[in-house]
């Protein structure tokens, strides 16, 4: 397919971008945002969005996690144009690239034996090995200058050897980041990095570069935490004689205490599938994620997917970290309140038929679904969802807060009982009101309201006393939709039964 012409001076070729997660956990919000920004950039410039699973850490990777990533991306509507590809499938290409560099004198075999076990952690030993390869210390490695023929003889004799890249003695690694500007790091600060371990296993920096070259990636869009790796990867690109792609590093997403948002520390609130299961609209979460680190340059916050594509640019990505303001104390605000507000706005604006389908999924998850909702009571379900949609922020709220509309088995809010059922006269008034409503011929909003007000006048009590008490009796709650809308929604039998049942709650 012919790609459309590009008008952005930063884009001079057909765009090919990739999202490259490691399947060591579920798709989290940071990964979801990275995938989204890559997807938006590709769509903006008529490019190709590729999914590559970087599964070379076999001990931590799993099929379950791979499927979790695929499910999360599909739910967000970020299906790739190419892939998924699996990095573990390209091991031979990675090794071939490293051996090519050795033959060209740009890398060397390192026969240094692994350290014997001691009290240091693996991380500490790795750091020590890296320090031994930095700056002038690199020259002290006897294998850096070992004759190629001698190195090959020892390898063919079966002696274990890692392959290291020869970092130039002088100069600096430099690249222009599309978010953070020019980045420079002196070669003396970069170790002769390992490309292939002595057991033949290719390491990350080599694998990712070889894969990006093979997939013709033009722009690498990823988290700021990769900035250090990028200097090393630029060296590998240059050693392989390949074009260096444009880089754009995205600001980190931080928790309220300005610590890095972590799936390990912050749990399910970081998982994309949590938002699916708890009743978010996919486009609402996409909209929210887009604004974590990017701004359209206007006050507009609610944007359709098409508007996001039209407005998105890497130049407008912020340099400062994005704050994800969730609360671990308030179960109602279990995630960022702005995300909940945004989802509520999407729910209110979406077609009722579409919202009903999403609510139906939640009713099934909470065992509240009745087959009649798909047939004879379909119209009732739609009316009920429409009645409640302005009050709820997620579709799960319909099955939790809205449970009294779909089941007779619900809990009464203790505060609502104290507020609305404290008048001892209600012990007699509620059953009598139930009998009066049972006789209403046309069970409509106006007819039931007239019956209640007539009864309150006969008994010499304020209508508000009965209205508030009836709301709690019918829903277990102190607030909600108009009380007579509730009455009509529940219908005559349930209204009468619940009013009588609630008399037992009056002190």
Regions found by a protein language model. Give the residues of each.
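Active-site cores that bind ATP or allylic diphosphates and position pyrophosphate for catalysis
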Residues: 109, 114-249, 254-263, 271-272, ...
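Glycine-rich phosphate/pyrophosphate-binding loops
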Residues: 43-57, 206-221, 243-254, 483-484, ...
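Residue-level signal for inorganic ion chemistry
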Residues: 38, 69, 101, 105, ...
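Catalytic adenosine-cofactor/nucleotide-binding cores of aminoacyl-tRNA synthetases and other
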Residues: 241-412, 475-507
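N-terminal Rossmann-like or analogous alpha/beta NTP/dinucleotide-binding catalytic cores
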Residues: 2-132, 229-242, 284
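Glycine- and acidic
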Residues: 17-24, 51-55, 214-220, 270, ...
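C-terminal accessory/binding modules appended to enzymatic or scaffolding proteins
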Residues: 356, 418-474, 479
């Amino acid at each position: 397919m012919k790609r459309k012409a590009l008008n952005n001076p930063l884009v001079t070729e057909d765009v090919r971008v990739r999202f490259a997660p490691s399947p060591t956990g579920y798709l989290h919000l940071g990964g979801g945002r990275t995938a989204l920004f890559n997807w938006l950039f590709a769509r903006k410039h008529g490019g190709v969005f590729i999914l590559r699973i970087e599964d070379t850490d076999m001990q931590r990777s799993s099929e379950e996690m791979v499927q979790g990533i695929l499910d999360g991306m599909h739910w967000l509507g970020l299906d790739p144009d190419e892939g998924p590809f699996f990095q573990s499938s390209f091991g031979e290409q990675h090794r071939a690239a490293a051996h090519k560099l050795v033959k060209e004198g740009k890398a060397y075999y390192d026969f240094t034996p692994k350290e014997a076990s001691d009290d240091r952690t693996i991380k500490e030993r790795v750091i020590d090995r890296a320090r031994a390869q930095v700056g002038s210390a690199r020259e002290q490695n006897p294998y850096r200058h070992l004759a190629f023929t001698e190195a090959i003889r020892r390898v063919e004799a079966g002696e274990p050897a890692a392959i290291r890249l020869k970092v130039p003695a002088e100069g600096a690694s430099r690249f222009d980041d599309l978010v953070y500007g020019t980045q420079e790091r002196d070669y003396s600060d970069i170790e002769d990095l390992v490309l292939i371990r002595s057991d033949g296993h290719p390491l990350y920096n080599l694998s990712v570069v070889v894969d990006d070259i093979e997939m013709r990636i033009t722009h690498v869009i990823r988290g700021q935490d990769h900035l250090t790796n990028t200097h090393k990867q630029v060296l590998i690109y240059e050693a392989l004689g390949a074009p260096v792609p444009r880089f754009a590093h995205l600001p980190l997403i931080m928790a309220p205490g300005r610590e890095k948002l972590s799936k390990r520390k912050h749990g399910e609130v970081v998982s994309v599938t949590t938002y699916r299961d708890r009743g978010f609209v996919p486009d609402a979460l996409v909209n929210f994620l887009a604004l974590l680190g990017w701004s359209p340059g206007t006050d507009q916050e609610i944007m359709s997917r098409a508007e996001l594509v039209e407005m998105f640019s890497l130049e407008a990505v912020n340099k400062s970290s994005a704050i994800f303001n969730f609360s671990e104390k308030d179960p109602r605000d279990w995630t960022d309140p702005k995300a909940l507000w945004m989802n509520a706005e999407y729910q209110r604006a979406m077609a009722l038929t579409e919202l009903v389908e999403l609510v139906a999924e939640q009713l099934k998850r909470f065992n509240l679904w009745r087959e009649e909702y798909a047939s004879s009571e379909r119209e009732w379900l739609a009316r009920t969802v429409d009645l409640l949609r302005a009050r709820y922020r997620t579709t799960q709220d319909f099955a939790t807060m809205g449970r009294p509309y779909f089941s007779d088995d619900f809990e009464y809010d203790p505060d609502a009982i104290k507020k609305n059922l404290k008048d001892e006269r209600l012990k007699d008034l509620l059953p009598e009101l139930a009998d009066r409503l049972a006789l209403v011929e046309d069970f409509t909003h106006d007819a039931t309201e007239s019956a209640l007000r007539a009864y309150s006048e006969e008994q010499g009590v304020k209508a508000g006393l009965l209205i508030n008490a009836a709301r709690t009796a019918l829903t277990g709650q102190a607030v909600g939709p108009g009380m007579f809308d509730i009455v009509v929604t529940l219908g005559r039998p349930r209204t009468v039964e619940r009013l009588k049942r609630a008399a037992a709650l009056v002190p």
